[in-house]
């Protein structure tokens, strides 16, 4: 859309019933109708955050044209144009057969359905280019070949390398280790932290592939990063820009602030949104007005929060416990004046264990 094209976002209401064998070592479990419908609805909602399907493009569901097809019509109108030898030669099929892993007719037929999608999108929306991950190359070329045979159309495909794990396997919900666009599956903070952990050698590639930063801007970021890699400026830029794209600028800012605090920064400047994000990540304990007015025993609070096993532990190792980043004063009670932004106080034990004391009348976002 940024380059003047009209994107068509294809939802697999039909192909989701089958399961794509590409990049898989074994058969996918079939989804029930309720799960599939929920997935399609979630994808529609998530895509709408990135593409204005009304003014910029369209969101289409392949069940609209595949659902009404009968088996006989599909075999007659589509199957007769497809060579079985070419289907067997696809990497997704050949790799399974070579390993004697086997493949059901259901998964074997998947490439025909996706190929047919390309034909239908060209007929109905004049779609000439299909863009996907590199694991979809075989399915895309199947569609290009089918469109040429059925309609004499010259279509094209563009793929990008997949982001893979250290073992070379792709990320995905069915293979484990996925990060989600949905905030209720992967929180903005967890999303931000994921990109902060990217190895130095991968940062430049990720910035180029996943952000809208210019090549010059990325080059400048990497130059600074290489001079002081311990400051992780490359990861910070990557985490900020991707979190902003997915969750918005405010969430990216709050995630960055929360991250700094959890990993050793001072919490004094935390604002309400950042505190709310922290509360959802590290846990919180609610306290009412009366408790705050009367004052709370700090040692008891650390036990109540789960940061200490007993008040004796707090007294014995007081130097390791902090309130809002400062060593705890066991002779001073904690009250409303200790709430940052009038919302919460941060309790810490060591460098990595944190808990928030939240005013009970406040709503955690």
Positions of PLM-derived features:
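NTP-dependent nucleotidyl-transfer catalytic core
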Residues: 1-136, 141-144, 151-156, 169
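Conserved nucleotide- and phosphate/pyrophosphate-binding catalytic cores
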Residues: 149-365
